[in-house]
Amino acid sequence: MNTRRNRLMMGIGIALALVSLSVPGRAQERSEPTGRDLLTRSKRVLFLGDSITAAGQYVANFDAWLVTELKDQAPKLIDCGLSSETVSGLSEDGHAGGKFPRPDLAERLDRVLKAVQPDLVIACYGINCGIYLPFDESRFGKYQGGMKQLKATVEKAGAKFVVMTPPFYDDVRAPKNFSYNDVLDRFSDWLIGQRKEGWTVIDLHGPMTKAVRERRSTEPQFTVQPDGVHPNDAGHWFIAQQLIKWAGDEKSAAAESPKSLLAARQMPESLLPLVQQRMSVLRDAYVAAAGHLRPGVAKGLPVNEAEAKAEELSKQITTLVSGASK
């Protein structure tokens, strides 16, 4: 009797287990969140990086996609990039003509996180971290350690962490007696390898290197970085495209430019300068509020005034998006 009962209970248990596996959504519940998931679950997204991020153009381009995709559910993007910055804590001799060493993110990170209170942090470092010298294990170790500390600090503050591999370095436009892009290959390969440790990594370096080299096969002078480092409009759009792909929208990421993206979505071009202005107002305010050691950075408005200005711009953005969506 007990044997029959035990067999019956075992059969019921197996059946329930099979049913639970077949219920839609069960597998997804155990999977890692997608880029879109991370964005829709966030109210405030902090961007950290060097001068490329500080310029803010790729952040604004990505924001233009966000506000047309998620509309009033889009998270607020706050750009706190700082020119010359590294996570390696290194600085070459005579940086900036000897006026100041490269700032180290670790010096200001806690203050930035406290000021911004982000739900999600997206960081892009590396092009400055090798200080434009040949590959060296010691410098590489400093970069690895800085990235690990950045991730740990962000997660301790309660935010999710996403990292982009560093951009392409244009050895043709800014030649050295070695390939600095090869150094960044090593940095990028290591970051991609951290995916197996649970890191969320967006690969910018690989696709950017491939795209430039393919274009140069027919246009030898082609570049998206006229000085070898800082992207032009097309370069910033390329970075934004990788973010849009990560967020799951391959179709929009294929647009040739931000204006093409807006046109395809039947959105007015006037949306883009509003998004760019909002980005600039918040960037200048929060970078100044957190404080840093780099001279020559615009102070910006006090945070409360900047937030009020950003809210005015957000209303104009919402009006444009809502009107175009009807």
Where in the sequence are the language-model features?
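Substrate-gating cap/lid alpha-helix
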Residues: 171-205
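Serine-esterase "nucleophile elbow" of acetyl-processing enzymes
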Residues: 27-84, 88-91, 99, 109-117, ...
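A short helix->loop->beta-strand "cap" motif at the edges of active sites that frequently abuts
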Residues: 155-160, 199
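Conserved catalytic region of serine esterases and O-acyltransferases that act on ester linkages
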Residues: 29, 40-41, 57, 197, ...
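Oxyanion-hole/transition-state-stabilizing segment in secreted/luminal serine hydrolases
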Residues: 38, 48, 58-60, 89-93, ...
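Bacterial N-terminal signal peptides
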Residues: 11-20
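Solvent-exposed loop/turn segments at secondary-structure junctions
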Residues: 51-54, 82-88, 120, 126-132, ...
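Bacterial N-terminal signal peptides that target proteins for export
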Residues: 2-12
